[in-house]
Each structure stands twice: as C-alpha cells, then as structure tokens.
C-alpha cells in the first residue's frame, strides 16, 4: 500500500435525479473509486471533476439512458495544473453500468459494468502500459441500504477483472468493498477498500488491508440540492 496520503477533491453535479424517500443525496453510483450497484435515473446526468495528486485532473460526464442503464465518458491529464509540459491521457475512457437486480428489503441490488478510467500517470511505451492505479474494467457489484437514525447507510462490494492493463503480467481478478453513511442532510462519510489484486502479489488467501491495496475515505458535503463536494483521502 502506498504510504503517501493524497488529498483529492471531487465536485459532482447531478441534474434530473429522483432521490429515494428520506434521502437528501442520490445513492452514489461510485463511492470514491469503487462502483456501487446504483445507476442514474433515465434523463438525469452527472458531471464530475477529480483533482489528483501532482496536478492531475479528470473530467467525467454520465447520463441515465434508462432507469437501469447509464453511460459515461471521462478524459483528463496527469499534470494539467503545474509548470511541466502538459501530457494528456492517451484516449477518453468509458463508464457503463446496467442494474441486473433491484434492491429489496431482504436482498441487495446487483449491477454489472465496465469502467476503463484509471488514475495517476499513464505509463505508456514501457513494459507496464497502464495507469498507476488500474481501472476496474469489467465488474459485478452489489449494494444494500438501510435507514438509520442518522440517515442512509449503504454497504457495497464487488469483483472486477481488467482486460487491457495486463502487460505487467498480473491478470488476477480484483475485489473491492465499502460503505457510505449520512451524518445529517448535508454531510456523509464514505469509505472503501480496493484490494488491487491485479497490481500486487497479494491473493484472496492472503488478503489483508495491511498488505496492500487502496484504502480511501471521503467526506461528502451537499452544498445545495444536486451539488456535492467531496474531500477525499487516498492511499
């Protein structure tokens, strides 16, 4: 696990989204980087901006095509802010998600998706040919939400496999999980763990947060309806 904690901020604007009863922010389609089973509703869209360590920035736009299917694109630079020669990522990246099973009182919602957007530098032209933090690729995610005295509590988990960032020889399936909880109508806390099994020599048998992966946390502030600011701490 990287010892350096990176401070990131994410601004998300969601238009046309219908919120569940009693919930003052939309169920997150992602926690910080981890995908959940939630999708944008038909006709709604979200615009996100991620500021990365080293002056990088990623802009993303997602739209709800149906109540179950969302489509998005993202693009950016690992050093947009700063004095170094500007470098862009090699291509726009895709983000697709389809909700297979609706969440019920007794069972979680389940979604499948594709996310090809990684983070950090893109190591092009060397033996890696990948982002510093690999994209999730194809994934299956599950989410379950409960109403608490504070607000909504959501638990999320999933498995993923990437098909392009494999030049480093690590093609292991990956595991991820996380949670989000409302503290009040304005503030929410998000936590996640991406085991990054396709980036290290850890396996499911030796899985441990202390051995590797990315442990992230964020504080989400709903400034006004449909406008959310996140202060994120990433390993």
Model-predicted segments: where are they?
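C-terminal intrinsically disordered extensions
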Residues: 1, 154, 165-167
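Glycine- and Gly-Pro-enriched alpha-helical subdomains that act as flexible
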Residues: 170-171
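Transmembrane beta-barrel domains of Gram-negative outer membranes and organellar outer membranes
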Residues: 17-153, 160-164, 182-235
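Mobile, glycine-rich extracellular loop/lid and propeptide segments
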Residues: 179
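Sec-dependent N-terminal signal peptides
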Residues: 3-14
């Amino acid at each position: 696990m990287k010892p350096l904690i990176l401070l990131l901020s994410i601004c998300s604007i969601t238009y046309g989204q219908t919120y569940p009863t009693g919930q003052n922010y939309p169920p997150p389609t992602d926690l910080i980087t981890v995908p959940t089973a939630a999708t944008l509703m038909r006709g709604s869209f979200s615009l996100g901006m991620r500021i990365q360590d080293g002056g990088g920035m990623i802009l993303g736009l997602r739209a709800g095509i149906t109540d179950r299917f969302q489509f998005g694109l993202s693009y950016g630079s690992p050093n947009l802010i700063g004095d170094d020669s500007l470098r862009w990522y090699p291509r726009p990246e895709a983000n697709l998600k389809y909700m297979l099973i609706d969440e019920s009182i007794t069972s979680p919602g389940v979604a499948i998706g594709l996310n090809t957007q990684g983070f950090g530098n893109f190591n092009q032209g060397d033996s890696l040919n990948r982002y510093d933090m690999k994209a999730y690729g194809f994934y299956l995610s599950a989410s379950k939400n409960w109403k608490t005295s504070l607000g909504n509590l959501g638990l999320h988990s999933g498995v993923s496999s990437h098909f392009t960032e494999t030049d480093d020889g690590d093609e292991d399936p990956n595991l991820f999980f996380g949670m989000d909880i409302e503290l009040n109508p304005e503030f929410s806390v998000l936590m996640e763990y991406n085991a990054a099994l396709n980036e290290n020599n850890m396996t499911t048998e030796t899985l441990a947060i202390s051995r590797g992966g990315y442990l992230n946390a964020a504080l989400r502030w709903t400034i006004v309806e449909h406008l959310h600011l996140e202060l994120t701490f990433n390993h």
